């Protein structure tokens, strides 16, 4: 099954955070928070403006983005946990 977001929504797959500190201490799953960065795997057509025009999104598939801890709606597709959110919930793109 594939999910196609509508309008200005994007689908993000969370990226795993480091589970070991710089000093070598392993952080258990119970002490870690959900990662607030992820890779965009699908984007909608764009934001519909008041005059009816459609503005293309500033992000694209493959971008790694930062987003708020409580952004979007979590969904499960084919056993994978994904987050569907509006482009406005994205704080920035991580450039390599």
From Swiss-Prot:
GO terms for biological process: chaperone cofactor-dependent protein refolding. It comes from the Bacteria. HAMAP family: CH10. It is found in: Cytoplasm. InterPro entries: Chaperonin_GroES, Chaperonin_GroES_sf, Chaprnonin_Cpn10_CS, GroES-like_sf. It comes from Legionella pneumophila. It holds the Pfam family Cpn10. Gene3D superfamilies: GroES chaperonin (2.30.33.40). Heptamer of 7 subunits arranged in a ring. Interacts with the chaperonin GroEL. GO terms for molecular function: ATP binding; metal ion binding; protein folding chaperone; protein-folding chaperone binding; unfolded protein binding. Together with the chaperonin GroEL, plays an essential role in assisting protein folding. The GroEL-GroES system forms a nano-cage that allows encapsulation of the non-native substrate proteins and provides a physical environment optimized to promote and accelerate protein folding. GroES binds to the apical surface of the GroEL ring, thereby capping the opening of the GroEL channel. Belongs to the GroES chaperonin family. This is Co-chaperonin GroES. GO terms for cellular component: cytoplasm. NCBIfam families: PRK00364.1-2, PRK00364.1-5, PRK00364.2-2, PRK00364.2-4, PRK00364.2-5. Its main location: cytoplasm. CDD domains: cpn10 (cd00320).
């Amino acid at each position: 099954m594939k999910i196609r977001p509508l309008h200005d929504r994007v689908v993000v797959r969370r990226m795993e955070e480091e589970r070991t500190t710089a000093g070598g201490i392993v952080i258990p799953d119970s002490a870690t928070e959900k990662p607030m960065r992820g890779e965009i795997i699908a984007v909608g057509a764009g934001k519909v403006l008041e005059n009816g025009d459609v503005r293309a999104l500033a992000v694209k598939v493959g971008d790694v983005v930062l987003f708020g801890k409580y952004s979007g709606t979590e969904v499960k597709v084919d056993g994978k946990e994904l987050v569907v959110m509006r482009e406005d919930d994205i704080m920035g793109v991580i450039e390599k």
